[in-house]
Amino acid sequence: MLGIGTLAKKVFGTPNDRKIKATRPLIAKINALEPEFEALSDQGIKDKTEDLRKRALAGESLDDLLPEAFANVREAARRALGLRAFDTQLMGGTFLHQGNISEMKTGEGKTLVATFPAYLNALTGKGVHVVTVNEYLAKRDSEWMSKVFGALGMTTGVIYSNQPEAEKMAAYQCDVTYATNNELGFDYLRDNMKPSLDQVFQKQHNFAIVDEVDSILIDEARTPLIISGPAEDRSELYETIDKLIPTLDEGHYEIDEKTRGVTFTDEGNEFLEESLLKAGLLEEGASLYDPESTTIVHHVNQALRAHKLFQRDKDYIVRDGNVVLIDEFTGRMMPGRRLSEGLHQAIEAKEGTDIQPENTTLASVTFQNYFRLYDKLSGMTGTAMTEAEEFAEIYGLGVVEVPTNRPIARIDEDDKVYRTANEKYAAMIAETKLAHEKGQPVLLGTTSIEKSELLSQLLQQEGIEHNVLNARHHEQEAKIVAEAGRLGAVTIATNMAGRGTDIQLGGNIDLKVMEALEANPDADPAVLRAEEEAKHAEEKQKVLEAGGLYVMASERHESRRIDNQLRGRSGRQGDPGRTSFYLSLEDDLMRIFGSERLDKLLSGLGMKEGEAIIHPWVNKSLERAQAKVEGRNFDMRKNVLKFDDVMNDQRKVVFAQRREIMASDDTHEIVTDMRHEVIDDLIDIYMPPKTYADQWDTQGLQDDVREKLNIDAPVVEWAAEEGVDDEQIRERLVEASDKLMAEKVEAFGQEGMSNIEKQVLLQTIDAKWREHLLTLEHLRSVVGFRGYAQRDPLNEYKNESFQLFESMLDSLRETVTQQLSRVRPLSEEEQREMMMQMAARQGMQRAAAPAAEPVEAPKEGFVEDDPSTWGNPSRNDKCPCGSGKKFKHCHGRLG
């Protein structure tokens, strides 16, 4: 019998069905234009782009241009790649243009889909960013799709790490730019540390199309991107504390597997206090609860987490003497990514590797806040519907499930639940053997390196040939994936095989042709390809007859999306396939999150050894457990975002102010206002409002004016004059400070002083923002405890961070004013001393490099050691003294 909800959906259709239906007239319009665009010459396609560009700039809406633009891209792709986009691909592209997430299954051609909205939105001249999860995909997609964009008369760029600056700048100026989410985020942070606007890469954030959007905007959402600098080396402290952890008993700590937390018990705290006193890390009479002990307690907690929560070969691997993290969602290594707040160092101490120094944060942003900078955002993935609520609530993105071009023929079996892990693995091996014997390719999915290697040993014992794909063997990934769909192939893979991999039945034809050419370089490539294609077609037919790719998973992940990604490797483009999950009561998800009802159901059935429970109720119960975990993780991400939003508002203010300063030719008004505000603050401190003259601290004001404004003002004498009030003293100080700064303008020249002001402003903003980030980090780490006092941690954080921000701005004004009041040109004596140092340094350089490059002959009347003969070099020219430095960093340096 149908439920009420199901019945209503059958009658009225789902919201998703209605969205699909609404695009059909648009797709019909694009299809109707096809003959017209097929008739265009290659130049005609480019001319069409120019026509559409002019119309877009003239104000015609992109929605109105969409049918012609999509028809143009379809024709360009057909000519450049030999691929004609399906109607479902046009549909996916339309939803992306509308600012949605298009959920498209594996093998449906998402890479080509992105070209349609990218082209349409690039017509405005504001640029489009296509975002991928790794550099391999960014480079591959850029190289592949640049043929389409080139045929359309558009430019394509790619962004990657360690890219030369000029190349990166050119890539950002292209119509369409492919990049990884990490590199985009880091470039944004670097841009906001640059000294001038012409060095900034990301001029605007117009439209981003995010591939594997759930991975980037949900799985990575809690991970901040951090640009950091070195802090003090404390490796000895980590090593000392690490030795304490193995001495703990189980009663000294409690592990909460649901929240991945571990805490000391009262008994553990007492033991810890004694151990720290013996180790000399706590002074006699000191307690763990003293404020001075906060740092030690923090490091002990991190060491406990490193030992009890982080497992080698699951959460990280040790490679070439370094601790390298593993992404829990993709199973890939994350070189360069480090855990913060001393946790990474604690793991290094545990593993006995070199302990890298801690870092201090220079700038940071989360992906949630970075991608919300874009005027328009959209995304593609094979699995998004389970997180539709989060996409809508946090990013304002709708999710549309785009129908497949051909119906899915894959069979998804009910889960098989065994009592023990050993019984489960035995059943998987037996099933693999049966499939292998009939030639059906098998993909065995695991959640960790350890489990993938255990399955590998079991297969070896049975004499079954197989490949293993995990973070240890990531270099062979492309080859292993290419062969995973071949006749009788058996592949064990961690979550690495779950995303961005396309397993083709019969194997990858391009790789087969390449290998055949390497083996026989003298052969005719066309003949060889025809031979390989014939063999491939025959092998593919046998694989299809055997049932297509069989995906077996060794356990369910906390997230249904990860399970669905693994399922999606099978049954691409209407191919047959089969998926099955093998579970046991010892699995993490079953043990930690399985409901009591499920436990009772299974124990009441009296399972025999090797017997499995297979029932839709079990699936439903597990999915409820997964939904519960997903809901909890969503709440955690929302909570992190609420706190990060507070910092984000401040970040936007600081970065916007910084950009304004970089863009400004004259910052004189800004620094003058700052200086006058500093004077106002000094008057308020030493001559508080509504006080009498005999209550003023005039000596304190005089000393502070000398310190902060570099003025010897006789404030004490002024205050002693008859009838002088605080306002008159303020005016005299303003006049004196204005006069001092006017003298500096005269000494340096208007342009020179403007450059100094801009430099001091930017450097001080950067330094103060760094300090502020560190303060906010500390506040964030302790504010949670306010909840025990019945105070809302978020409100406490908002209020205190705002006060800290105001204090930072006050400190910024003071520092800028103080530094500018002390700049001066170098004296003749200082210049002579500098020239002597230069001459000595040049002598050493000549001695060290007698065969130096030839230098340009000096001009007539020019004496290298006499600045009076140098004329008026520009600040950015090479210094005439021959040091090789810019003039502004050498003899033109400011004192």
Swiss-Prot record:
Binding residues annotated for ATP, in chain numbering: Q89, G107, E108, G109, K110, T111, D502
Assembly mode: Monomer and homodimer. Part of the essential Sec protein translocation apparatus which comprises SecA, SecYEG and auxiliary proteins SecDF-YajC and YidC.
Cross-referenced InterPro entries: Helicase_ATP-bd, Helicase_C-like, P-loop_NTPase, SEC_C_motif, SecA, SecA_CS, SecA_DEAD, SecA_motor_DEAD
Cofactor(s) essential for the protein: Zn(2+)
GO biological process, one term: protein import
Binding annotation for Zn(2+): C879, C881, C890, H891
One example GO MF annotation: metal ion binding
Protein name as annotated: Protein translocase subunit SecA
Name of a matching Pfam family: SecA_SW
Subcellular localization, as worded in the UniProt entry: Cell inner membrane; Cytoplasm
Entry's cofactor comment: May bind 1 zinc ion per subunit.
Membrane-related topology note: Peripheral membrane protein
Role: Part of the Sec protein translocase complex. Interacts with the SecYEG preprotein conducting channel. Has a central role in coupling the hydrolysis of ATP to the transfer of proteins into and across the cell membrane, serving both as a receptor for the preprotein-SecB complex and as an ATP-driven molecular motor driving the stepwise translocation of polypeptide chains across the membrane.
EC number: 7.4.2.8
SUPFAM superfamilies membership: Helical scaffold and wing domains of SecA, P-loop containing nucleoside triphosphate hydrolases, Pre-protein crosslinking domain of SecA
Keywords: ATP-binding, Cell inner membrane, Cell membrane, Cytoplasm, Membrane, Metal-binding, Nucleotide-binding, Protein transport, Translocase, Translocation, Transport, Zinc
Gene3D superfamilies: Helical scaffold and wing domains of SecA (1.10.3060.10), P-loop containing nucleotide triphosphate hydrolases (3.40.50.300), SecA, preprotein cross-linking domain (3.90.1440.10)
Region (Disordered): 560-579, 848-884
Name of the gene this protein is made from: secA
Record-linked NCBIfam families: PRK12904.1, secA
Lineage: Bacteria, Pseudomonadati, Pseudomonadota, Alphaproteobacteria, Rhodobacterales
Catalytic activity, as annotated: ATP + H2O + cellular proteinSide 1 = ADP + phosphate + cellular proteinSide 2
Major localization class: membrane
